[in-house]
Curated annotation (Swiss-Prot):
GO molecular function, one term: phosphorelay response regulator activity
Designated name of the protein: Regulatory protein VirG
UniProt modified residues of type 4-aspartylphosphate: D52
PROSITE patterns: OMPR_PHOB, RESPONSE_REGULATORY
Amino acid sequence: MKHVLVIDDDVAMRHLIVEYLTIHAFKVTAVADSKQFNRVLSSETVDVAVVDLNLGREDGLEIVRTLATKSDVPMIIISGDRLEEADKVVALELGATDFIAKPFGTREFLARIRVALRERPSVARTKDRRSFYFADWTLNIRQRRLISEEGGEIKLTAGEFNLLVAFLEKPRDVLSREQLLIASRVREEEVYDRSIDVLIFRLRRKLEGDPTSPQLIKTARGAGYFFDADVNVSYGGMMAA
């Protein structure tokens, strides 16, 4: 049974979500604040997180940010107001995977939950024993850790991690925006011109320091982006030929 964790300070909304998803064979935990939310995350397996941005005294985006750096759990943002493009950019930067505005239909909400579950990184990837070595970095797939040559760890959101893996699997191959959208798991109906550009900019900033003068992730004008570096890969400690 898949576990959905919901944070919303609206009691009626929590009851509605719990009742509806339970009918459709989900385990649902609904909480009102980040303290309860984090307690559940630390003690139980969660398959999808639903985060309300309007939490009164708390910042829903900060909850999204914290979760994205700790987990690959898909996050659906719900809001009482229609999200503008700027809000979506911020949410994508922080690691959100889907958006829905109140009031919403229960059938649509259920459909989005199911899509998020389908798009979650597969069990095969969590058992992936590959490590990629490039420039001054190591990316461990199973542990989802990006480590610098000096030993420092850089936190990646789920979208950034998926995007980097796509580049490392095909170094120096030009990848179109469409390919990168699929790789990063940005939902097609939420795509707009800046979706991939935002993720690329953030990934450049984390890898290179100066995203305005990229040396690793380069632009192929009119075609997409490519990763311009030698990449070595090992499988469980054994370097590939």
